[in-house]
Amino acid sequence: MNFRHVRMLLLLFTMILWNVLLNAWILERTRQINCFSYETALYSFRKHRVSGELLARMQEEAEEKGMSEKELFAVYFAEDGSVTDPGQLAVEALYAKRYQPQAYARICGYLSAVWDDLERFPVGTVASDGNAGVSFADSWMQSRNFGGERGHEGCDIMASVNERGIYPIYSVSDGVVENVGWLRLGGYRIGIRSPSGAYFYYAHLAEYAKEFEVGETVLGGTHMGYMGDTG
């Protein structure tokens, strides 16, 4: 083999190596750019499809890795729930934290705002009827036409007993009253800002349990009023 052939082989090897390295760089760069979709995470977070079994697996993985389960769920929501393996989510969380830190931190913050302050379910039992229950479904941004065409910015909790003023409504968290009183679309409502920044909005009340004032501090479990259909 003469020198010319050796040089051609070296050139070919260099080109192949360069092509492999370039493809690896492109794949890695693409992964960095697409490792976390804030828009998808926000949409999926609002859907909040989380089972008790998945939560338990996430908590176990997070404890093992020295992370918070919220860090894993932020990526889970960014994948629109398509990835459920906690180990894989832990790896993707590292990418998101490194290459999309602001978007990732915002979703983690939303999770903290909701999860960290929750103390109870907002609807209590009916003293006069132990079988009276409630149900709810994902109604976020469903079409509404009262007051004009719009999307529904809430989740309605429906009573099995269609009677105003028998289901007690409680604050799900500690917080400060930010809004209270009559609203055309929401009827009698009260809005509570929790310590972590979440805004919990209780609308369509039949009546208040007492006279609340803006700026007033409430505790989780505070009786705020009764379920109704005002507004």
Report the location of each language-model feature.
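Structural recognition of the beta-strand scaffold that forms the well-ordered cores
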Residues: D156, P168-S171, G191-R193, F200-H204, ...
